[in-house]
Amino acid sequence: MREIVHLQTGQCGNQIGAAFWQTISGEHGLDGSGVYNGTSDLQLERMNVYFNEASGNKYVPRAVLVDLEPGTMDAVRAGPXGQLFRPDNFVFGQSGAGNNWAKGHYTEGAELVDQVLDVVRREAEGCDCLQGFQITHSLGGGTGAGMGTLLISKIREEFPDRMMATFSVMPSPKVSDTVVEPYNATLSVHQLVENSDATFCIDNEALYDICMRTLKLNNPSYGDLNHLVSAVMSGVTTCLRFPGQLNSDLRKLAVNMVPFPRLHFFMVGFAPLTSRGAHSFRAVTVPELTQQIFDPKNMMAASDFRNGRYLTCSAIYRGKVSMKEVEDQIRNVQNKNTAYFVEWIPNNVQTALCSIPPRGLKMSSTFVGNSTSIQELFKRVGDQFTAMFRRKAFLHWYTGEGMDEMEFTEAESNMNDLVSEYQQYQEASVSEGEEEYDEEAPLEGEE
């Protein structure tokens, strides 16, 4: 079967990763130590996309856990799903990267990277037909951003034809954890543009908003945020983990979602949104789900798609859903909101169905959108980057680890290029002839 190797790096990546494994081991009927006691054969049928089978009916996540300090790892090991993971797959240093991208990418991380690659190699060799890799990390810190992108490029070298998907937590406009976030994020995006096939952008602030506005949680914890992220990750990977009528894998998703190789940064959403404890008691319908996933308040990245246009998007429905109803609803959304979809990609909404809903819900739907409005996110980080870089603030931390200012300049211009590419396609129309516009312009005035 088509296996995926999962990597989680840094504190954020490990916490999101732990939440993800907790969610999907529950969906596949595994208990806290990986023993299968599920009810349906469907749970077993594609178990091996994410799990290796060990002796005694036990399943082990195909996960590699990486960090430059032992703290988070110990927490994961002591957590509810800590007994799931293979002990050899914990790879950690002692020094920490101290929120410094250069430490993660060039010094501390580079020393640990071969050890990680050995584990990755071992996991990949155990696969029948490796589909690709997914990595969870944040872009604002040192380990997840610096070492995470280092791992991505190393894995890219070794497995050039496998898919590389990343779940990347972007720095938020209002919620900032570290002062040097803009540096770390820009350097990371510079890497992701080149080396990732699909990047799902997640943003703490958008998650906070969802928790407070929709779930009515007054002071959400990271646990609540990670719960939302794991719901989306579970949704995006549903088609890989369960048989469905309209199935997709990482490559199909990428083929349908990425019109131009550099523009592979997606917004994600999930419906129905429920808080961790309470499952909704009302029946959800396909129209409701569809309306919810196309609602800007449901997006887990702090950019409003109404300021841009969708190049492509994909909706994954789970549960007992009628195919015709889904098709009608999606067509309905497209017809009513033609302004938000580029007209030079007809039928740019892809749908997938899977009959197994998440635990505790009758049906749910996950949304992945490639919208030009994601440029807001990069623009915001870019502005903060420029403000600091102009004064060369904090640069000595990076140059001290052997980085060159040139690299910062390159990263900055690469990100600016990305923003203008999104802008260019946002404004593009079907009849891309400049001279035609000039002829049409006076006509509008005459009417």
From Swiss-Prot:
GTP binds at Q11, E69, S138, G142, T143, G144, N204, N226. Residues 432-447 have a biased composition (Acidic residues). It holds the Pfam family Tubulin_C. Mg(2+) binds at E69. Its cofactor is Mg(2+). This is Tubulin beta chain. The gene is TUB1. Keywords: Cytoplasm, Cytoskeleton, GTP-binding, Magnesium, Metal-binding, Microtubule, Nucleotide-binding. It is found in: Cytoplasm, Cytoskeleton. One of its GO terms (molecular function) is GTPase activity. One of its GO terms (biological process) is microtubule-based process. Belongs to the tubulin family. The keyword Secreted does not apply. Its main location: cytoplasm. Coiled coil: none annotated. PROSITE patterns: TUBULIN, TUBULIN_B_AUTOREG. Residues 424-447 are annotated as: Disordered. The lineage of its organism: Eukaryota, Fungi, Dikarya, Ascomycota, Pezizomycotina.
